[in-house]
Regions:
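Residues that mark the start of a beta-strand
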Residues: 1-2
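Acidic/glycine-enriched connector segments
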Residues: 11-122
Length: 122
């Protein structure tokens, strides 16, 4: 199963992410982990997948794109992750507007979304 992991740049609860991803991976058998290659949740997810030998597909916004179109670059990257990455599942950790944008786009595209709340019992 192809999974896209997203969450805030300030997300730092590695323990929560490890618990959630380990459980979901056991249930669903992730074959690829897609992420936006930003600090925070994306970095933790990348390290998690690396430790488990799960191939990673990072979608970084090129600096020139940030310079040229500013904050519009993030939503364009989010759409690329969905269009090119073709995830079967989105796992969304706590975050801000970018995370909400990924979730909204995934729902619109018919991709299953699992939203993680810090209060969830993992």
């Amino acid at each position: 199963m192809r999974v896209l992991v997203c969450g805030g740049r300030d997300f730092d609860d590695a323990g929560l992410m490890i618990s959630v991803l380990d459980r979901l991976h056991t249930e669903k058998c992730f074959t690829v982990l897609i992420h936006g290659n930003a600090r925070g949740a994306d970095g933790i997810a990348d390290a998690w997948a690396s430790c488990r030998s799960i191939p990673r597909e990072p979608y970084e916004v090129p600096q020139g794109e940030w310079d040229e179109i500013g904050k519009k670059a993030g939503p364009l990257r989010n759409q690329r992750m969905l269009d090119e990455g073709r995830p079967d599942l989105v796992v969304a950790f706590p975050g801000g507007g970018g995370t909400k944008d990924v979730v909204r786009r995934a729902v619109k595209a018919g991709v299953s979304v699992h939203e993680v709340n810090r209060a969830d019992d993992w």
